[in-house]
Structures are given as C-alpha cells and as structure tokens.
C-alpha cells in the first residue's frame, strides 16, 4: 500500500460552469476516479486548488461591501473556499465509497501553511486568481483598484496576488494521525491558508499559495510515497502544440531540469507542477512524482502519465 498525495486543480473544478451545481458535477466526476484508486488499496490525501474560486469570492466580497458588511480579507477567503470545495469533495467521496461498500471515513481539514514574511512575492505578485479577462477588460479592472493583471498561459488576463513559497503545513501532525487512522483526508485546500510566524503566533497574510508547491510540502511532511499532480492532459509534453510535440513518460530529475532550461514549460501553467515534482523526488530514490489527468489515475500503477523520479 502506497501513501499518495493527490493534487487537484482549481481550474479543473471550475471548468465552464461557475455555478454551485456545475462545480459539484466536476467534483463528482473526479471523486469516481479517486474512489476507484482507493478501492485498489491505496492510501490517499487530497489537496485542491482554488484560483478561480477565491478570485470570484473576492469579487463578491468587494461588490457587496458596505460599512456594516466589510469585505473579508484574502486569507479568510482562502479559508472559505477550503470549506466549500472541501465540502464538495467530502460529500462526493463519501457517496462514492458508499456505492462501493468502502468503509473509510472522509474529512476536510482547514489547513494553515507557514510562509516567510520576507518572501519576495509579497512585493511582486504572481499568482493568477479569478476569472479571465480580455486585455481591454483587464485594463479597465486595473484602473479601478490598482491591481495587477497578467496574461495567463494564452487563455486571457487574470488578476495576480502574492504567492509565497510554502514552508510547512501547520496541521501536519493532525494529518498524519488521520492517515494512520485510515481516514481519507482533504487538506491544504487552495494551497493552504498562508500564515507567518510572529512572536510565537501564527498570523494570516493576504496571499494565495500555489497548490502544487503546498502539496509537495505536505507530501514531504507526511513522508508520502507518491505525489500525483492532476492536470488536463495525460502527460507532460515538450514542444507542446507543435508538429514535433512529444509526450514524456518516465524521466529523471536531470532530464526534467534540462527541459526547463530549454524553456518547454509555461511559467503560469505546467512549470510550477514540474518544479514541485522535482522538489519532492530530489535525493530520494524511492519517491515518485506523477503528472497526469484524473481519467488516467486508474492506470498509474501501469506507469501511465509522466513519471518523474531521481534516476528516471
């Protein structure tokens, strides 16, 4: 039995239908594959992103702001999306386990992630959140509140916020205890609520952590065997969308680093996933990181997807 940390993207959850029902339907679809994976005897911790959701929630907060109903800060919005998406996943997985007669409890944990208050991202926001805009729409939004908008992997323009590098999962001991009790745990949602340590206390900061880097830290903190990062394609590609594109199957740390140097991976898209995978497997021959689609999860034991390991 392997311990697997599975990272599910927020963009995958909010695909085309931003309604409550639409996002639940996507989560229900993902839960079927995760349940089948668990049915094979695998231990699983589920993390999820929240980029579109937290951005939309922040817009709702700003739109409804008044003296008696002030907008909540970004770290609180991250916590709120942990609750909503965690509920959807918890409900969907519980239902799928019931269908399969799997006697495994499911729980969502509100998770704080310690970051460095001196992290350079606080001065240079880089994490895209919220909806996509045209260039004209983004310029108009930026003029309203001075926020920064950047192009996101050719899909349009999005607001960017600080995204400090995760250092530690504050609730890691609780997560370990739940795993040892054979509880499927949903945690570190949206990359975790970013907090800094000040005078022996944890204090929330306005930022959104990258869920793949947080999943990597979580996988290290609980000594997971595999980090599985789910995305919209079955494999990583080099020369993506070119006539000579090539799917990568099993690659070493050295090979992945060379592909990064050659500029094959977009900074706001596949690059952070690969960097998180590399950080997890470096220096440990037993660990594997796998990047693939949710539909390919059932084939992972057959070396499906892109498998990154120390030696390839």
From Swiss-Prot:
InterPro entries the record matches:
AceGlu_kinase-like_sf, Asp/Glu/Uridylate_kinase, Carb_kinase
Group of enzyme by EC = transferase
Checking Pfam families in the record gives: AA_kinase
Q: Pathway, according to UniProt?
A: Metabolic intermediate metabolism; carbamoyl phosphate degradation; CO(2) and NH(3) from carbamoyl phosphate: step 1/1
Which keywords fit this entry according to its UniProt record?
Arginine metabolism, ATP-binding, Cytoplasm, Kinase, Nucleotide-binding, Transferase
> Which GO cellular component does the record give, naming just one?
cytosol
Q: Which EC number(s) are documented for this chain?
A: 2.7.2.2
Please indicate which superkingdom the organism of origin belongs to.
Bacteria
Which compartments does it reside in? Cytoplasm
Cystine links in this protein are none
Instruction: Cite a single GO MF annotation.
Output: carbamate kinase activity
One example of a Gene Ontology biological process annotation = arginine deiminase pathway
Q: What is catalyzed by this enzyme?
A: hydrogencarbonate + NH4(+) + ATP = carbamoyl phosphate + ADP + H2O + H(+)
User: What family does the database annotate?
Assistant: Belongs to the carbamate kinase family.
What is the designated name of this protein? Answer: Carbamate kinase 2
Give the originating organism.
Enterococcus faecalis (strain ATCC 700802 / V583)
């Amino acid at each position: 039995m392997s311990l697997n940390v599975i990272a599910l993207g927020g963009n995958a959850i909010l695909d085309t239908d931003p309604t409550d029902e639409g996002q639940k339907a996507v989560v229900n679809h993902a839960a079927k594959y995760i349940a089948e994976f668990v049915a094979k005897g695998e231990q699983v911790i589920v993390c999820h992103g929240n980029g579109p959701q937290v951005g939309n929630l922040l817009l709702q907060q700003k739109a409804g702001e008044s003296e008696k109903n002030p907008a909540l800060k970004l770290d609180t919005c991250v916590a709120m999306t942990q609750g909503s998406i965690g509920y959807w996943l918890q409900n969907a997985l519980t239902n799928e386990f019931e269908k399969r007669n799997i006697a495994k409890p499911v729980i969502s944990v509100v998770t704080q992630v310690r970051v460095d208050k001196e992290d350079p991202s606080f001065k240079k926001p880089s994490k895209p959140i919220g909806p996509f805009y045209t260039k004209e729409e983004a310029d108009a939004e930026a003029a309203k509140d001075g926020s920064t908008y950047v192009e996101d992997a050719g899909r349009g323009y999005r607001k960017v916020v600080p995204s400090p590098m995760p250092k530690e999962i504050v609730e890691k001991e609780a997560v370990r205890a739940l795993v040892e009790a054979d509880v499927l745990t949903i945690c570190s949602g949206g990359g975790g609520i970013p907090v800094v340590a000040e005078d022996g206390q944890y204090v929330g900061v306005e930022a959104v952590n990258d869920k793949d880097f947080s999943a990597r830290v979580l996988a290290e903190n609980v000594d997971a065997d595999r980090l599985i990062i789910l995305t919209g394609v079955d494999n990583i590609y080099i020369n993506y969308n070119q006539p000579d594109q090539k799917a990568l199957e099993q690659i070493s740390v050295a090979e992945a680093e060379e592909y990064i140097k050659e500029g094959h991976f977009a900074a706001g898209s596949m690059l952070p996933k690969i960097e998180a995978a590399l950080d997890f497997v470096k220096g440990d021959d037993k660990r594997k990181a796998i990047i693939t689609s949710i539909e390919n999860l059932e084939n992972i034991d057959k070396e499906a997807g892109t498998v990154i390991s120390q030696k390839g």
